[in-house]
């Protein structure tokens, strides 16, 4: 029996080699779909009619909140001047991105969370892929795409969608791929990295809650169970100083750690490096400085993960599987490329070139040394 890596590699290579013919075969095999891949203008119009007016208002207000939060992250230049010389960074948006929207449960919020910071960054071209169900794309996903000005939506799922975006099969290839998926999608993203950029390899959802005796036990339990709803591989931890709360939340799927004090709770949280960390204590702000590893920190009883997932305006694309030790939340800057900018004055060049000349000598780079020495 083939392992996941080999199985995905063979599909990717087949699509890269045979192009559309192979892509259509896999679409029929996995999605039972044999029609045109690109969503037509008529399908966008039909989808808009299918979304109730009340839901349209919910989506639009949610998107406004997301836009307000993410717009504050934008920056296009960071410069400083020293001795007449100019140094800094300029930021340029990625030219073309692909967004994978999972199809198991339609996730219009995924498209909002990725599409809005992309637009704020100035990304010019966005292609969306999502698995069709009965030959159609979820109308809520199409409505969000329309609001974002995205005209390219493709009925493609799984490894085939990643191959299409990375190799330019049935569409122009993208520069970077965003969006969560199952283990096949994750493995495909891992294998095409280097040909294109990727955001991250999203795993099962996670929540850790630090809570003390002041926490409402029903709030805490509801929050822990909310993340287990994502699937059987989801993880939930309760880190608490309260024996009563520990006993109340001891349910299947929840790992309870009874700690001596809140400092130990914070220490355990850093070891877990959870995707979401709620702190529901009498003074939650006092623990923030102790937290080093978490995708997001939500303070107090009225900042549950589902609120962040849907309406707070913060981004819910977060590192999982302990990746919060070395990566963080999706931001506008993930859609931009920092480029070094420098213009050095003659005065500063002549004052400091001796440093470069000596380093070039140490490294045996004579032509480098000469490039510095020749200037007068």
UniProtKB/Swiss-Prot annotation:
Instruction: Give the top-rank taxon of the lineage listed in the UniProt record for this protein.
Output: Archaea
Q: Any coiled-coil ranges, and where?
A: none
Q: How is the cofactor bound?
A: Binds 1 zinc ion per subunit.
Positions contributing to Zn(2+) binding: 227, 230, 309, 368
Is the keyword Transcription assigned to this protein? no
Q: Where is the active site?
A: 275-276
Q: Which reaction does it catalyse?
A: L-histidinol + 2 NAD(+) + H2O = L-histidine + 2 NADH + 3 H(+)
**Which InterPro entries does the protein's record reference?**
Ald_DH/histidinol_DH, Histidinol_DH_CS, Hstdl_DH
A cellular component annotation (GO) from this entry: cytoplasm
Positions bound to NAD(+) = 100, 182
- What biological-process GO terms show up in the record? L-histidine biosynthetic process
Cofactors demanded by this protein:
Zn(2+)
Q: Which pathway does it serve? A: Amino-acid biosynthesis; L-histidine biosynthesis; L-histidine from 5-phospho-alpha-D-ribose 1-diphosphate: step 9/9
EC numbers: 1.1.1.23
Q: Which UniProt keywords apply?
A: Amino-acid biosynthesis, Histidine biosynthesis, Metal-binding, NAD, Oxidoreductase, Zinc
Function summary: Catalyzes the sequential NAD-dependent oxidations of L-histidinol to L-histidinaldehyde and then to L-histidine.
Family of this protein: Belongs to the histidinol dehydrogenase family.
Entry protein name: Histidinol dehydrogenase
Species of provenance: Thermococcus kodakarensis (strain ATCC BAA-918 / JCM 12380 / KOD1)
Q: What is the lineage of its organism?
A: Archaea, Methanobacteriati, Methanobacteriota, Thermococci, Thermococcales
